[in-house]
A protein has these predicted regions:
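N-terminal beta1-alpha1 cap of cysteine-dependent amidohydrolase-like domains
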Residues: 1-314, 319-357, 365-398
């Protein structure tokens, strides 16, 4: 939102009171603003920022620093004008020019000396140089990939740009580690409910497929059919949460011979409830805020793909689900070639599944994308991207 929005008023009043209580030496107000460029006049306009600061002053808040979003560099004349009419130092007018990638922003802010300005205004003594070698190394690999791969993202919410934002960013992190540009191809799962030929046309040119998390019946069969195709074609597969559950159902139906296997979320009366509500969820009638949320421990099976990726046997991952694999079917699926490589030690809940006779087929009940960062890319995403590059090489050699 913006300063003038009525929804912002409680927060602005809280900020005003906080600044009064802490004192100006212990509190800093940084105002992010837009400097639009008028192409007809070929000039940057400062009036919106001047009015925005005026609105902020009406709430009792004087900004200390202006961070100015812009398509073009700010001239010194514009900086002086903003400083004069917004009542800040010229050095406190920070240019935030449009960047090639969001990961450029920290270095651009360093170039504008935003860090030094903040330290000076808060009268902090610690002026150590930031250690940005790892960040710069990441940017170098991100911008100079040695090759590229295409990974299909099969989901139900692809029309919403940020629905799978964490997954997209995890691929950015993992791609940089593998010096690889990951082209994520959105595929709506409902588009995979047609003929086998249509599925083949959509998936055959991909180097890997990730089946995304989700809820509800819509698009489930499309996900299951996509998983069957990649399993049979030996294409690397990664399933997250619902994606893992769909993988279990697919193997149960087409390998273990349990043709009616389903999740009770979709078919409560199924003869083979491969995926079922967790016991502690069955008596819950109010669904708001009652899922299995947060971090839980997981123990990995030795010599599994998961253990190789993590390089350890004990991990902790974040969750958001109600349904789980039904352990009553564990023996049958193990006979079908499924490996239960990650188990919660307290509840025996299945956290990770794999397939023996497949180059890289892995599903997780947890959400690995929620822990991936630039400096610590998630090991499963790194391993998956690596598997996709190996598949690409093998395909070229054929």
């Amino acid at each position: 939102g913006i300063v003038g929005d009525i929804e912002s008023l409680p927060y602005l009043e809280s900020l005003r009171q906080l600044r009064w209580e802490l004192g100006s030496d212990n509190c800093l107000v940084i105002h992010l603003t837009l400097i639009p460029y008028l192409r007809a006049a070929k000039e940057l306009k400062t009036k919106p920022t001047q009015h925005s600061v005026k609105e902020l002053l009406n709430t009792g808040i004087q900004p200390d620093i202006l961070v100015c979003r812009s398509e073009y560099p700010l001239t010194m004349d514009i900086r002086r004008k903003l400083a004069l009419f917004c009542n800040v130092d010229v050095g406190s007018v920070i240019e935030a020019i449009d960047a090639e990638t969001i990961y450029d922003v920290p270095l651009l802010m360093l170039k504008e000396k935003l860090d030094a300005t903040v330290i000076t205004k808060l009268r902090l003594k610690d002026r150590r140089e930031p250690r940005l070698k790892a960040w710069k190394d990441f940017l170098g690999k991100l911008k100079n990939p040695t090759h590229g791969i295409r990974i299909g993202l099969v989901g139900k919410y692809n029309e919403l740009q940020d629905a799978y934002k964490s997954i997209h960013e995890s691929f950015v992190h993992a791609g940089a580690v593998n010096e690889c540009n990951v082209d994520v191809v959105p595929i709506h799962s409902e588009q995979l409910e047609g003929s086998d030929e249509e599925i083949r046309e959509r998936l055959q040119d991909l180097h890997g497929v990730l089946v995304a998390p989700g809820f509800g019946e819509r698009g489930i069969e499309g996900k299951i059919r996509a998983i069957r195709y990649v399993r049979e074609q030996q294409i690397p597969f990664f399933g997250i949460c619902l994606g893992m559950q769909c993988a279990v159902i697919e193997v149960a139906r087409h390998v273990a011979g349990l043709e009616q296997a389903a999740s009770t979320e979709v078919d409560p009366a199924t003869d083979h409830p491969i995926i079922d509500l967790m016991p502690e969820q069955k008596n819950i009638t109010k669904l708001g805020g009652t899922m299995r949320l947060g971090a839980y421990d997981c123990e990995l099976r030795r010599r599994s793909k998961a253990a190789k990726a993590y390089a350890t046997l004990k991990i902790s991952e974040r969750h958001r689900h109600r349904y789980e694999f039904n352990n009553a079917y564990k023996a049958q699926l193990e006979k079908a070639g499924m490996v239960f490589s990650g188990i919660n030690p307290q509840t025996e809940l299945v956290e990770i599944i794999e397939l023996k006779d497949h180059p890289w087929f892995l599903g997780t009940q947890f959400h690995p994308e929620l822990k991936s960062t630039v400096e610590n890319p998630h090991p499963l995403f790194v391993a998956f991207v690596h598997a996709c590059t190996e598949y690409q090489k093998a395909k070229k050699d054929q």
